[in-house]
């Protein structure tokens, strides 16, 4: 499908309130890359930094956030103290977010890699489900950074990334977005490790 060939894409799915935040999430990452002279990219980093860029995106589009804040988790009779990765409030819509980050070997066995991705998103959703807030405001988020190991570059990054994205889209989710370097510009020696972009998957608990 055509959308898998796009270098950036947003599908807010069942979470329309997330759409402007996801659009801003793409914008702030592009702004960072531009400020760094295209020598560094937001998706080069792990969970904590990825959460920070999502937080920045919410502020950029008129929301407010809290990061890594102390809260209570679990059933009220078995409350325990913990931390929530990110709270977003925008136009009276709240999201209490627990996030995970992972690298996915884009050239690995598709079935195995998709199982890993689904498992990590399940973990994020599970963590969100024990937050003491309304069920509809709980949100698990997974940041997935695909990578191509040295010596494993495809003949066509465009084709390969499109196929990889189609696979990732089969993982059950409520919303999805991604950002990639322009694929026609992707190149490098086979000895280089390449991480060309990032995917965000979000899902609410059942």
Put a short name on every predicted segment.
Residues 135-206:
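Glycine-rich, aromatic-bearing surface loops/beta-hairpins
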Residues 59-79, 85-89:
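A short acidic/basic microdomain associated with nuclease active sites
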Residues 1-53, 57:
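Interdomain/boundary linker segments immediately adjacent to catalytic/signaling cores
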Residues 85-105:
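Conserved catalytic cores of phosphodiester-cleaving nucleases, focusing on short active-site segments
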Residues 47, 68-72, 98:
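Acidic-residue sensor for enzyme active/binding pockets
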Residues 32-50, 64-66, 131-139, 177:
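Short glycine-rich, low-complexity/disordered patches
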Residues 25, 29, 54-58, 62, ...:
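Hydrophobic, Leu/Ile/Phe/Ala-enriched alpha-helical segments that form helix-helix packing faces
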Residues 99-157:
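Catalytic cores of nucleic-acid endonucleases
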